[in-house]
């Protein structure tokens, strides 16, 4: 295996580390941790207290599972961040606006389906990159790497935080995507471009929802999501659970359709962690733009030549009666 391979980057899961993760995976925030400090401490602060306690109690050496991120917490790094709620609400409002002001309902539905497939793949690549302990101290993505990797240590953090927290975790990447696609690629004035970009953002938020629900106990899982999981439209707990066992599979968090091809590439075809990082950067800055270049002529043919527009408008009208 070449130097800088992904298999070398991610330490093996030892029996001791797997037992430690399993011990914490179904636990609520410990009462002792919740009471440490101000009694009115919110969930983000309580999780950070728990992270510090776990780091302080863990004895390891370089190469051990989770050693790098635990060491960073010991050195004072903060894992879970307070997000800017107004910014997230602005993103939500703009996403709805961008979809509703697209060329047509049929165009928006097509864009939603295409970006739904794309975001599952993009999320898997992002997951591979942010799971890499060698990237913990890289500029721009280091903080996200720390939070991603600590999710392996405290998997329940995604269920004890409400969905607003999970959605707001995307503030940075959503801002970057909107900045690139709306400003650099003329999406501010092009309703078709804007609609596709906003559909991609909507699917990114759906990915956060799917990830959170995959961690929920069956009795607490939303019944609509449970149906979508059964239909294969949202990632199932079984698929995502495989990721938490070995960390070398189960990377997608939206539908999971890309799990098999991405896992094959990760294990056998693309060994270099730097190639995955390059793919992540390329998709972040050019993925949606490339998708739009692919979709626009396809949509024009389907709507004008294929007669999809009238069919979808007829379906929408009948469904409202």
Predicted segments, located by residue:
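Short, mixed-charge amphipathic alpha-helical segments
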Residues: 224-232
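Interfacial helix-loop-helix junctions of multi-pass membrane proteins
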Residues: 214, 218-225, 249
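Non-catalytic, topology-defining segments of multipass membrane proteins
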Residues: 2-200, 204, 209, 231-321
């Amino acid at each position: 295996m070449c130097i800088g391979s992904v298999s070398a980057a991610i330490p093996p899961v030892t029996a001791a580390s797997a037992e430690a993760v399993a011990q914490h995976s179904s636990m609520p925030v410990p009462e002792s941790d919740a009471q440490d400090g101000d009694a009115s401490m919110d969930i983000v602060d309580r999780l950070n207290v728990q992270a510090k306690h776990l780091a302080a109690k863990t004895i390891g050496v370089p190469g051990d599972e989770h050693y790098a991120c635990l060491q960073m917490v010991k050195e004072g790094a903060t894992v879970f961040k307070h997000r800017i709620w107004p910014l997230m609400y602005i993103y939500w409002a703009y996403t709805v606006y961008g979809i509703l002001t697209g060329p047509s309902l049929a165009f928006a539905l097509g864009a939603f389906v295409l970006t739904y497939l794309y975001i599952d793949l993009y999320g898997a690549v992002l997951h591979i990159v942010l799971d890499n302990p060698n990237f913990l101290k890289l500029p721009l993505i280091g903080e996200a790497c720390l939070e991603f990797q600590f999710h392996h240590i405290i998997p329940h953090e995604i269920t004890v935080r409400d969905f607003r927290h999970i959605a707001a975790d995307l503030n940075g990447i959503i801002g970057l995507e909107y900045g690139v696609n709306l400003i650099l690629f003329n999406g501010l004035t092009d309703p078709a471009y804007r609609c596709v970009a906003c559909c991609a953002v909507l699917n990114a938020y759906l990915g956060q929802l799917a990830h959170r629900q995959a961690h929920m106990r069956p009795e607490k899982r939303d019944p609509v999501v449970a149906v979508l999981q059964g239909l294969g439209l949202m990632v199932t707990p079984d698929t995502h659970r495989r990721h938490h066992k070995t960390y070398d599979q189960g990377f997608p968090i939206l539908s999971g359709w890309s799990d098999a091809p991405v896992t094959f590439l990760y294990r056998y075809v693309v060994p270099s962690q730097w190639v995955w990082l390059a793919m992540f950067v390329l998709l972040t800055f050019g993925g949606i733009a490339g998708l739009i270049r692919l979709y626009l002529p396809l949509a024009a043919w389907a709507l004008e030549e294929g007669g999809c527009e009238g069919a979808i408008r007829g379906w929408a009208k009948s469904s409202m009666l």
